[in-house]
């Protein structure tokens, strides 16, 4: 009788052990509940967010979130192998299938607000704050001569943002023609060096080049700031003097340029 009981106990133990392993394996296959908190995104600047959640093996979830829902947590079910959370506002037509943002050569940067983060999701529930911030700098150029006959070309070496939010290397060009008041503007992406420049082009040749990136760096402007500010540039009639003013700053910087 004792041998029968011992045998029965062994069978029951094996069944429990097999069941436990099975439950554990099933839980691993279950998705992670990802809670996204938009409460630190300013609805006045960001009326909506186009959410791209990417994980391995081709998982790409796209969700449109209106600002009225920013006060509530958004719950998504994602694979348990980590997820990249990208959110955009103002980037329609520029976001690729892999979640990166590409600026076509000849176009300016879209007036985009963005969030990028990577979340570990090897768990039953994960939490992430989504902070959508301004990721473009609007450079407005004032030319002293209102009847300015030339085109102003802004060139750089950043052409968008990678899937991880880092500035993407590539040629950038946007051509501007000042209006009747001598004003024009361009939106540029976040920079990583001083390569940004401003060319004065008469249609056949570059007459003058301004080291725009160096002027901006000398001003103390922070390209790594969470939200990028805007810049105003002034060019005198002879194109030999540059003024630079950063949005929200009282001081104005002056640079003399050799002809």
Question: Positions of the model-derived regions?
Answer:
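Sec-dependent bacterial lipoprotein signal peptides
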Residues: 1-24
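Extracytoplasmic cysteine-anchoring/structural motifs
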Residues: 20-259
């Amino acid at each position: 009788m004792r041998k029968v009981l011992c045998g029965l106990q062994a069978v029951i133990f094996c069944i429990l052990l097999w069941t436990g392993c099975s439950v554990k394996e099933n839980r691993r296959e279950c998705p992670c509940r990802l809670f996204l908190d938009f409460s630190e995104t300013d609805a006045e600047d960001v009326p909506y967010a186009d959410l791209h959640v990417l994980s391995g093996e081709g998982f790409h979830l796209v969700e449109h979130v209106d600002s009225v829902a920013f006060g509530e947590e958004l719950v998504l079910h994602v694979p348990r192998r980590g997820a990249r959370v990208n959110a955009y506002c103002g980037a329609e037509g520029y976001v690729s299938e892999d979640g990166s943002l590409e600026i076509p050569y000849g176009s300016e940067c879209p007036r985009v607000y963005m969030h990028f983060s990577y979340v570990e999701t090897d768990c039953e529930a994960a939490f992430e704050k989504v902070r959508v911030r301004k990721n473009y700098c609007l450079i407005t150029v004032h030319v002293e001569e209102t009847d300015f006959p030339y085109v102003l070309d802004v060139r750089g070496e950043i052409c968008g943002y990678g899937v991880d939010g880092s500035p993407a290397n590539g040629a950038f060009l946007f051509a501007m023609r000042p209006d009747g008041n001598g004003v024009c503007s361009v939106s540029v992406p976040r920079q990583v060096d001083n390569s940004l420049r401003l060319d004065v082009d008469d249609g056949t040749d570059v007459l003058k080049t301004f080291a725009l990136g160096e002027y901006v760096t000398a001003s103390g402007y922070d390209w790594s700031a969470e939200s990028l500010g805007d810049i105003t540039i002034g060019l005198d009639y002879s194109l030999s003097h540059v003024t630079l003013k950063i949005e929200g700053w009282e001081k104005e910087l002056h640079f003399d340029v050799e002809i």
